[in-house]
Design a protein with these regions (language model features):
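The feature captures the beta-strand-to-loop junction immediately N-terminal to the Walker
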Residues: 39-41
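Helix-to-loop junction immediately C-terminal to a conserved catalytic motif
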Residues: 54
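Conserved ABC transporter NBD signature motif
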Residues: 62-73, 78
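ABC-family P-loop ATPase nucleotide-binding domains
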Residues: 86-136
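Pre-Walker A (P-loop) beta-loop-beta motif of ABC nucleotide-binding domains
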Residues: 26-37
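ABC nucleotide-binding domain signature
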Residues: 37, 80-87
């Protein structure tokens, strides 16, 4: 494997109980500093694959390597180097921006509150407003 390979997904499979859906032989390679978008029809497995990559779901089989090393589903270290934008924010709608900062500080060891609040200030977002009121 070339050392510029950041993430390698090789023949990853997932099938849900009581469902006809199958993610079959999903494979992709992402190089360092590369931005990737997953495109496909509804139900093709895009969200399932992303959820496997970030540890929200377990794969049935196949391999996922980060800089050439296989990582377990609960392994947080490599996930801090992957950015994912979901269709919905995976935090309760009743939280405020200040609350989100506290939550993310507890999850991500590399969370940068200063950068976060610099962006909040730049976009002129109110700190005490619940996130459910913001547009996507």
């Amino acid at each position: 494997m070339d050392m510029t390979t950041l993430l390698n997904v090789d023949r990853v499979n997932k099938q849900y109980k009581d469902s006809e859906f199958k993610l079959q032989d999903a494979s992709l390679t992402i190089s360092t500093n590369e931005t990737v978008g997953l495109i496909g029809k509804n139900g093709s497995g895009k969200s399932t694959l992303i959820n496997i990559l970030v540890g929200n779901r377990h794969k049935d089989n196949g391999s996922i390597t980060f800089f050439g090393e296989e990582h377990a589903a609960g392994d947080v270290e490599y996930k801090e180097h992957i950015g994912v934008v979901f269709d919905d924010l995976r935090v309760p709608n009743k939280l405020t921006i200040k609350d989100i900062d506290k939550v993310f500080q507890s999850i991500y060891t590399t969370w940068n509150s200063q950068k976060f609040f610099d962006l909040i200030k730049y976009f002129e977002l109110p700190l005490q407003t619940k996130i459910k009121t913001f547009s996507r």
